[in-house]
Amino acid sequence: DFEITPDVAIVDPDLAETMPQKLVAHTGMDAMTHAIEAYVSTANCDFTDPLALHAIKMIQNDLVDSYNGDMAKRDSMHNAQCLAGMAFSNALLGIVHSMAHKTGAAFADYGAHIIHGAANAMYLPKVIAFNAKDETAKKRYGDIADFMGLGGDSLDEKVALLIAYLRRMNDDLKIPHCIKNYGADSYPAEQGFVPEEVFLERLPEIAANAILDACTGSNPRQPSQEEMEKLLKCCYYDTEVDF
């Protein structure tokens, strides 16, 4: 509801100085997801694109150092998350957030609250691979890769390099690549909290709820029930998105 969008945000970097390291990682990747989803959203525009791209570049430059204790970078990240928020408050989001919203508490009875920022970090590379089957979205992801200086000649190469970069960033922040390996305090684990049989049992309902999430409407590629289930499986097993 745009009626509750704030007119003013007080961005005080002192508030971020005592953040626990894991919170720095999760909120940072949440901000990266906000910016990337805003840039490829069907509601993107000339006013949101610069905010999204600049936020992405700041996060690329500053998040890992902020995670490792650099307070100047922590201050910069505080600004980056605000810019990303300004972008998505106007351009909206996509199915990374739809999936994160619906999986967050879905396995709480197994002690597995999937923290929102960690969920976004795990799902973002998979959703990029899914959305990039849409040519308009692929071009937008290529723009992001170019702005980040990742290289690549073809659009396919640029998308692959963007996905690889985000996965390396997750490694640097000690965020797992998939739900199966989502362990204590969201750290990677050989066997995570969510049993495979429980995930598969709840998958159809989670997928249906994700499709109905408000963020799905502005995603560049609209998933079917079957596609959403397959995509969530890729996020559980860390398998390739080839559909």
Predicted regions and their residues:
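A glycine/threonine-rich phosphate-anchoring loop and its flanking beta-alpha core
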Residues: 1-44, 139-143
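Short glycine/threonine-rich catalytic loop with a Thr-x-Gly-x-Asp
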Residues: 24-29, 48-52, 112-115
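Short alpha-helical scaffolding segments that buttress acidic/His motifs in well-ordered protein cores
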Residues: 32-36, 77-85, 99, 124, ...
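Glycine-rich phosphate/diphosphate-binding loops and the adjacent beta-loop-alpha structural elements
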Residues: 38-90, 94, 104-109
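Conserved phosphate/anionic-ligand binding catalytic regions in large, soluble enzymes, centered on
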Residues: 89-101, 112-122
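Gly/Pro-rich interdomain helix-loop hinge
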Residues: 106-198, 241
